[in-house]
Amino acid sequence: MSKVCIIGTTTWGITLGTVIAHKGREVMLWARTEDEAALLSAQRRPADFLPEDYYFPEYLNVTASLEEALSGADMVLMAVPSQRMRPNIRLAAPLLTKNMLVCSASKGLEIGTAKRMSQVIADEISPDFSQNICVLSGPNLAMEILKGLPAVTVLAADTEKTAKKAAKLVTASNFCAYTNTDIIGVELGGSLKNIIALGAGIADGLSFGNNAKSALITRGLTEISALGAALGANPLTFSGLAGLGDLIATCSSNLSRNHFVGVELTKGRSLNDIMYSMSNVAEGVSTTAVAYELARSMDLEMPVTENIYNVLYNNADPKEAARKLMAAQAAHELAGRKWDLFKMFRRRRTRKTPELNPD
């Protein structure tokens, strides 16, 4: 029987564990304390967890022993907040074995380094295991998946072999895993879309309507593609499941934590108050700060990101920021804003179109 270790008793970690265990694979969920492990094992569910009729499936178990959790595992899934990735993978690193896949299921960028989670993992594990690193990302709202609704995701790695191996471990009847070898693009799509989800929440909170929100999402996707390409991603990845797919799901659903934060900001609540009231992390808040600094350092114009940054960190009024963004001076939709990557989509005429033979 295949075994998967999940580090992170987060909603997303438990959701992934549930999907994998329902397929008949052994899942060991690592809890940081004996008390947490004992409580989860006894109740077979987290407290205040939705849906209310949810319980751990038969093959999902909990332990406070990291050695036990990792022993014999084919893959370790890191389902922790992005700012906690480094200390957690550092704990696991000495216990990893040569053939064990190490998969990030976190969607964020590290504050201070601007590194993607696969880069953080690579920093902390032996170089001998670097070919085993992969990431999971896509339009994956945890509550829908826990209800058994169909969903798809993307497993990305530097090689198709590693991506396929990881995809096979997580694929289930209602959870299909596609593969991709653009690990940079898949990670950035999942991380940067949270910024736009904050903006979509602001638009919804202000009742700006679908026209304005669709414009925001579309311009946001352009910014994601621009920054992503500048960082080495394939721009086409952002038109796929880990880009556009994840963006649509997160920007249009009330289940999204980042969308929730955006809505609450329009009610006059402070960011600290909103974050303190939440049981889970809204990754877009920290990712906005990282992306804003990246854009400045690379001389990229990202007005959507900049305006959301000002709302979060400079106390800008959400309504004024949104109106300012919508009233921005129009220019060519795809070019003219230092986004040289879009030149690659322009068709070059190397010869005249041949004339048709009238005969």
Curated annotation (Swiss-Prot):
Its main location: cytoplasm. It is an enzyme of class 1 (oxidoreductase). Catalyzes the reduction of the glycolytic intermediate dihydroxyacetone phosphate (DHAP) to sn-glycerol 3-phosphate (G3P), the key precursor for phospholipid synthesis. Its EC number is 1.1.1.94. The lineage of its organism: Bacteria, Bacillati, Chloroflexota, Dehalococcoidia, Dehalococcoidales. NADPH binds at residues 11-12, 32, 107, 142, 257, 281, 283. NCBIfam families: PRK00094.1-2 (NF000940), PRK00094.1-4 (NF000942). The keyword Lipid biosynthesis applies. Belongs to the NAD-dependent glycerol-3-phosphate dehydrogenase family. It is found in: Cytoplasm. Pathway: Membrane lipid metabolism; glycerophospholipid metabolism. One of its GO terms (biological process) is glycerophospholipid metabolic process. Gene3D superfamilies: N-(1-d-carboxylethyl)-l-norvaline Dehydrogenase, domain 2, NAD(P)-binding Rossmann-like Domain. It comes from Dehalococcoides mccartyi (strain ATCC BAA-2266 / KCTC 15142 / 195). Keywords: Cytoplasm, Lipid biosynthesis, Lipid metabolism, NAD, NADP, Nucleotide-binding, Oxidoreductase, Phospholipid biosynthesis, Phospholipid metabolism. Sn-glycerol 3-phosphate binds at residues 107, 138, 193, 246, 256-258. This is Glycerol-3-phosphate dehydrogenase [NAD(P)+]. GO terms for molecular function: glycerol-3-phosphate dehydrogenase [NAD(P)+] activity; NAD binding. It catalyses: sn-glycerol 3-phosphate + NAD(+) = dihydroxyacetone phosphate + NADH + H(+); sn-glycerol 3-phosphate + NADP(+) = dihydroxyacetone phosphate + NADPH + H(+).
